[in-house]
Regions:
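Cleavable N-terminal targeting peptides that direct proteins into the secretory/outer-membrane pathway or into
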Residues: 1-34
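Glutamine-centric residue-chemistry signal
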Residues: 26-27, 47, 54, 149, ...
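Acidic, small-polar-rich N-terminal luminal/periplasmic segments of exported/outer-membrane proteins
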Residues: 35-173
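Structural signature of outer-membrane beta-barrel domains
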Residues: 49-51, 94, 105, 167, ...
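Short, acidic/hydrophobic/Gly-rich beta-strand patch recurrent on exposed beta strands
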Residues: 101, 207, 341
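Short, well-ordered secondary-structure micro-motifs
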Residues: 111, 190, 255-257
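Outer-membrane beta-barrel translocator/receptor signature
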Residues: 113-115, 127, 137-146, 151-229, ...
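Outer-membrane beta-barrel domain signature, strongest for Gram-negative TonB-dependent receptors
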Residues: 224-377
Length: 378
C-alpha cells in the first residue's frame, strides 16, 4: 500500500508593487459617495462574452490571484484547495486527473481525452498533462464551470471546464509588481510582471514565475523546481479592432512525486488476505529509503514475478517543457464581436516515477496541437 503524505508549510510573502496595481476584477460604480457600502462586481467570460458573474446563467466559480496566493497554491494541481466541487487526483509525473462534482476521467493515461475541458488563455488544452503543471502566476482569474458544458466547450466538457485567464496588457499604463515568498522545506518562490505602454495604441506585458522547494519526503521526493515566462503584445489601432499576441514557456526539472511504504498485506493463494503488517518506517520516509528498499526486495514479490530491485533518487526525475503561441483578434461590429484565435501548443515530457510497491515507470511523451477558433458573440 502506498501513501502520499501532504505536508502544509508556513509561508511568509513579500510583495513590492511598482506603479499602479493591476485589479483582478472590474468594479461597478462606486456607491460609497452616498455612504452605502458596495460589493465588487466580478466580470467573467465563461459564456464566451464579457458579463457580470451575477448575470451569468451558468454554475461558475471564480478565483483571483490574491486568493490563490493566500492559499499557498503552487500549480493547477492545488485548485481543489479553493473549491469543494473540484477533485484532483495527482498521479506520477504529470499524470493528473481532474473531477468536477465527481465527474471526470477514471484513468491517468496521457493518451485518453479528459472529461474536464481546460483552456489556457482561451486555447483548449488537448491533454490534462498540459495543464497539471501550469504555474498560477499573473492571472486575472481562474473560472471553474460545473458541467455538463458541451454546448459551448465541446464533447470533452462533460464534467465541466477550467479557464485560466492571464492579466492582459493595458494601454496607457506603466506598472508592475514583484512578489516573493519563503517557507518551510527551503521554499523560495518569486513572481512578477511589468506592463509597459509603448504608445497610445501599443502595450506589452512580461511576467514570470519561479519556485524552488525541497521535497516533503526525507529522500527529497515530492519537491518543486520550476519556472515560467509569458510575454504579450497588444495593438489597438482604433475602437473596433484589437490584436493581441502571446507566447509562454514553462519548465519543470525536479525529482518528482513519491510515496511512503506504511505496511503490507499478505495475499496467499488460498484463504483470506492476512492482517495489515506495519512497515515500521517513519512517516515521509519516501520510496528510496533503505528500509523501503529492504521490504521491496525481500517481501514485495511473488513466485509469479521477479523480486523488485532497489531504487535510488537517480531513478526518479521529471524533465518537462510546455510551450505555447497564440493570437487573439477581436473586431467590434454593430451586431456583436467577431473573434479569431489561432494557436499552437507543444509539450516535451520525460519523467520516471515510482513507489515502494512497483518498479520505476518511464514515460516519454511529445504532444503538439494546432487550433483555430472563430466565433461571433452578441
Amino acid at each position: 500500500m502506498v501513501k502520499v503524505a501532504l505536508t502544509a508549510s508556513s509561508v511568509t510573502a513579500l510583495t513590492l508593487v511598482l506603479g499602479l496595481p493591476t485589479a483582478s476584477a472590474q468594479q461597478a460604480d462606486d456607491p460609497t459617495a452616498s455612504g452605502i457600502a458596495g460589493l465588487e462586481e466580478v466580470i467573467v467570460t465563461a459564456q464566451r462574452r464579457v458579463e457580470s458573474l451575477q448575470d451569468a446563467a451558468i454554475p461558475v466559480q471564480t478565483f483571483d490571484q490574491d486568493q490563490m496566493t493566500q492559499a499557498g497554491m503552487e500549480s493547477a494541481q492545488d485548485l481543489a484547495l479553493l473549491s469543494p466541487a473540484l477533485g484532483i487526483s495527482a498521479g506520477g509525473g504529470p499524470l493528473t486527473s481532474f473531477f468536477v462534482r465527481g465527474v471526470g476521467a477514471l484513468t491517468v493515461n496521457p493518451l485518453t481525452d479528459s472529461a474536464i475541458a481546460q483552456n489556457y488563455d482561451g486555447v483548449y488544452l488537448g491533454r490534462s498533462s498540459g495543464a497539471a503543471g501550469n504555474a498560477l502566476y499573473d492571472l486575472e482569474r481562474v473560472e471553474l464551470l460545473k458541467g455538463p458544458q458541451g454546448t459551448l466547450y465541446g464533447r470533452n466538457a462533460t464534467g465541466g471546464v477550467i479557464n485560466y485567464i492571464p492579466v492582459k496588457p493595458m494601454l496607457g499604463e506603466n506598472s508592475g509588481f514583484i512578489q516573493g515568498e519563503v517557507g518551510d522545506y527551503s521554499k523560495v518562490g518569486l513572481q512578477g510582471a511589468a506592463n509597459i505602454a509603448v504608445s497610445d495604441t501599443v502595450a506589452i506585458r512580461v511576467s514570470g514565475n519561479s519556485l524552488d522547494r525541497d521535497g516533503y519526503s526525507d529522500d527529497d521526493t515530492n519537491d518543486q523546481d520550476s519556472y515560467s515566462l509569458r510575454g504579450q503584445l497588444l495593438f489597438e489601432p482604433n475602437d473596433k479592432l484589437s490584436i493581441r499576441l502571446s507566447a509562454d514557456y514553462s519548465k519543470v526539472d525536479n525529482v518528482g512525486p513519491g510515496g511512503d511504504l506504511i505496511g503490507t498485506y499478505a495475499n496467499p493463494p488460498l484463504g483470506e488476505i492476512t492482517d495489515f503488517t506495519p512497515s515500521g518506517l517513519s512517516e515521509n520516509s519516501g520510496p528510496t529509503d533503505p528500509g523501503a528498499n529492504d521490504i521491496r526486495t525481500g517481501v514485495l514479490h511473488t513466485p509469479s514475478f521477479a523480486p523488485f530491485q532497489p531504487i535510488d533518487q537517480d531513478d526518479l526525475y521529471q524533465d518537462i517543457d510546455w510551450t505555447g503561441y497564440m493570437a487573439e483578434v477581436n473586431y467590434q461590429t454593430e451586431l456583436g464581436t467577431l473573434t479569431f484565435i489561432p494557436a499552437y501548443r507543444e509539450s516535451d515530457q520525460d519523467y520516471q516515477f515510482s513507489g515502494p510497491g512497483f518498479a520505476p515507470a518511464k514515460t516519454l511523451e511529445d504532444n503538439d496541437q494546432t487550433t483555430f477558433e472563430l466565433r461571433f458573440a452578441t
